[in-house]
């Protein structure tokens, strides 16, 4: 055990929570790096995509985020727990500072709809990439049913391209009328 004066102490840092922020300090897309003896830039790299094409749904957090259990395509792969966000859609949020009662009700309805379709079932993933929070981003299929499109068609979701979200003033009104 180190004596107190030799231990790392967050109290010496002006803003100790700054070490947990997501700011990209020191990031430059035109800076060169050496990787395995090769001089590269950010643009020479590609975003990682999980080598996965499906799994069994073990949790439905909300209508656009599920958790699957799956192995990776190599011998003796352990069974991984992976968070998957449905590509191209946004659904009502269950939690958050600005979540209204209307949105909570709509969110639970949408989550229950998805849960009844996919929970404990095998789903297929297509167009697999990663999204900004590290989750898998994919088109989800149950048999031949494209879940992402079904949620849009049945008005449990709105289109979302990864940028600024445009959500309905009332999710329940949107579900009934289609008016955003």
Question: Language-model segments: which ranges?
Answer:
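Small beta-barrel nucleic-acid-binding modules, primarily SNase/OB-fold domains
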Residues: 3-180
């Amino acid at each position: 055990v180190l004596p107190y004066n030799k231990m790392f102490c967050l109290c010496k840092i002006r803003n100790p929570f700054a070490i947990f922020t997501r700011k990209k300090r020191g990031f430059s897309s035109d800076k060169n790096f050496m990787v395995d003896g090769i001089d590269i830039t950010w643009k020479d790299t590609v975003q990682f995509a999980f080598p996965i094409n499906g799994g069994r749904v073990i949790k439905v957090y909300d209508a656009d985020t599920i958790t699957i259990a799956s192995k990776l395509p190599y011998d003796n792969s352990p069974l991984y727990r992976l968070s998957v966000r449905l590509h191209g859609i946004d659904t009502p949020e269950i939690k958050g500072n600005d979540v209204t009662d209307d949105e909570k009700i709509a969110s639970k309805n949408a989550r229950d709809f998805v849960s009844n379709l996919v929970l404990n079932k095998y789903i297929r993933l297509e167009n697999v990439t990663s999204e900004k929070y590290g989750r898998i981003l994919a088109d989800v299929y149950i048999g031949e049913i494209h879940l992402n499109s079904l949620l849009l068609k049945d008005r449990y979701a709105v289109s979302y391209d990864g940028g600024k979200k445009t959500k309905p003033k009332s999710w329940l009104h949107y579900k009934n009328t289609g008016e955003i």
